[in-house]
Amino acid sequence: MIKYYNRKNKDYDIEKVAGEKYLNWTYSSPIGMNLLEAFIKKKFFSKIYGFYCDRRLSRKKINKFINDFEIDMSLSENQLSDLTCFNDFFTRKLKKEARPIKADKNLLISPGDGKILAYENLNLNSVTEVKGINYSFYELINNDSLAKEYDNGTCLVLRLCPTDYHRFHFIDNGICENTIKLKGFYYSVNPIALSKIPSVFCKNKREYSIFYSENFGDIIFMEVGATCVGSIIQTYKPNTKILKGDEKGYFKFGGSTVILFFKENTIKIDNDILNQSKLGYETSVIMGEPIGSRK
C-alpha cells in the first residue's frame, strides 16, 4: 500500500498501483528476486516488453487500463480511435488547457505529473531516496566536479507511475545542453521496489543534462529509466532557446522518475511538500503546478 499526500483535499490518498501483485511478488519472494536479478532487471526484458507495447496487438490493453485507473481521455490531444498501440496511449500528448503554465517568472513549477519528494541542504554523500535509504550524488551523476557545485542545494524527485501523463517539461526559460547517458539496469522505481533494492537510482539506466535557466540557476535535469521502460526519448533541441513549459521528452511504457538538482540559495520549495517529504510521504502534483518559488 502506497500512501501519498493530496494537496487539494489536504489529506492522504492510497495510490492505485499498476501491476501491484506482480511488484509485491517480484520484490518480496525469493523466486521473484532471483528472476529479477537474472532477467527482469536486464535491458533485454524491458526491450521485449517495449517491442510488444509498440505493436497493434497491445492496443487491446488500452480500454481496460483507462477503466481500471480512471484515466480522463478528454484531456488528450488524440481520440481513442487514433491510438494504434499501447505506447501511443502511454505517451499521449495533452491539450494545452489541461496543463496551464503560469507566466510568473518567480514561480517554480512541476516538470511533470506524478508524486514528488523534496530535499533541502543536499549532502552529496547521502541523498535520501525513499524510506530512509540513501545514495551518493557523486555516484548518481558520475561527475565529481559537477556534483560539488550542488553541495547544500535542493533535490526534487518526481516519480511518474504508469497511470500518469508521461511527458516531462522545462520549468523555466533557458538553454539546455546535450544529454549525457549513463548505462544501468531496469529496476522498478515504485516505492515497493525502492525499499528492497538500495540505491536504485544509481543502478538504473539514466540520462541527465544541464539546463541553464533564466530564473533558477543551472539545474541538473535527470531522467531515470525503470522496468519495462522501452526508452527515454529526448525531444528538445540542445543549445537552443527554450520557453517555460516546453516539452523536454517522454518515457515509453513503465514507471519512471525525473530528478532535478538546484544550487544552494536558488529556490524555496512550498512548505507542504517539504513537510510531507520529511514525514516520508510523496505529494501528488501535475505538470505546470506551482511547487515553489525563486529565492
Curated annotation (Swiss-Prot):
Q: How does it assemble?
A: Heterodimer of a large membrane-associated beta subunit and a small pyruvoyl-containing alpha subunit.
Q: Which residue numbers mark the site Cleavage (non-hydrolytic)? A: 255-256
Protein's UniProt name: Phosphatidylserine decarboxylase proenzyme
Q: Name one GO molecular function term.
A: phosphatidylserine decarboxylase activity
GO BP terms in the entry? phosphatidylethanolamine biosynthetic process
Similarity comment: family membership: Belongs to the phosphatidylserine decarboxylase family. PSD-B subfamily. Prokaryotic type II sub-subfamily.
PTM note says: Is synthesized initially as an inactive proenzyme. Formation of the active enzyme involves a self-maturation process in which the active site pyruvoyl group is generated from an internal serine residue via an autocatalytic post-translational modification. Two non-identical subunits are generated from the proenzyme in this reaction, and the pyruvate is formed at the N-terminus of the alpha chain, which is derived from the carboxyl end of the proenzyme.
What highest taxon heads this organism's lineage? Bacteria
Sorted alphabetically, which keywords does the UniProt record give? Cell membrane, Decarboxylase, Lipid biosynthesis, Lipid metabolism, Lyase, Membrane, Phospholipid biosynthesis, Phospholipid metabolism, Pyruvate, Zymogen
Q: What is its main location?
A: membrane
Could you give the cofactor binding note from the entry? Binds 1 pyruvoyl group covalently per subunit.
Its UniProt entry gives the catalysed reaction(s) as: a 1,2-diacyl-sn-glycero-3-phospho-L-serine + H(+) = a 1,2-diacyl-sn-glycero-3-phosphoethanolamine + CO2
PTM-bearing positions, type Pyruvic acid (Ser): 256
The entry's active site is: 113, 169, 256
Instruction: Kindly list the places in or outside the cell where this protein is found, as annotated in its UniProt entry.
Output: Cell membrane
EC no. given is 4.1.1.65
Could you tell me which pathway this protein works in? Phospholipid metabolism; phosphatidylethanolamine biosynthesis; phosphatidylethanolamine from CDP-diacylglycerol: step 2/2
Quote the cellular component terms of the Gene Ontology held in the record: plasma membrane
